[in-house]
Amino acid sequence: MPRKGPAPSRPLVNDPVYGSQLVTQLVNKVLLDGKKSIAERIVYGALEQARDKTGTDPVVTLKRAMDNVKPALEVRSRRVGGATYQVPVEVRPDRSTTLALRWLVTFSRARREKTMVERLANEILDASNGLGASVKRREDTHKMAEANRAFAHYRW
């Protein structure tokens, strides 16, 4: 266990193209093997495709998708006596953003379109319309929290 405490969080720079921290976070989530230029190409291409298909600002579309994917509740394991309970807890805003971005990228990679640009663009568009696997993941998370509501008094 480190004695210094948690590492301080560094400030995120705004994205050079769209001027948005959210786009910077998305680029960092798409990033594989340190190849940032490729990650930027994928994200910018996906946002351009989203602009072409909707005719609106892609950052607004991305924010709408994020609002539809961000979880409000999740379950965490808590051991009480000999039993492990799934205790529903509220999700902190920074964690909900991180989870939403992670789910968007993960389910984009699992899609069947030909290129990652198309996959990410279509997942963002689906999520902004309340469809897609990432929105389903959020609903499943909320259902799980609702089903385990009886254990909410074990919150810490």
UniProtKB/Swiss-Prot annotation:
GO terms for molecular function: rRNA binding; structural constituent of ribosome; tRNA binding. The keyword rRNA-binding applies. The keyword Ribonucleoprotein applies. Keywords: Ribonucleoprotein, Ribosomal protein, RNA-binding, rRNA-binding, tRNA-binding. PROSITE patterns: RIBOSOMAL_S7. GO terms for cellular component: small ribosomal subunit. Disulfide bonds: none annotated. It comes from the Bacteria. HAMAP family: Ribosomal_uS7_B. One of the primary rRNA binding proteins, it binds directly to 16S rRNA where it nucleates assembly of the head domain of the 30S subunit. Is located at the subunit interface close to the decoding center, probably blocks exit of the E-site tRNA. NCBIfam families: rpsG_bact (TIGR01029). Belongs to the universal ribosomal protein uS7 family. This is Small ribosomal subunit protein uS7. It comes from Mycobacteroides abscessus (strain ATCC 19977 / DSM 44196 / CCUG 20993 / CIP 104536 / JCM 13569 / NCTC 13031 / TMC 1543 / L948).
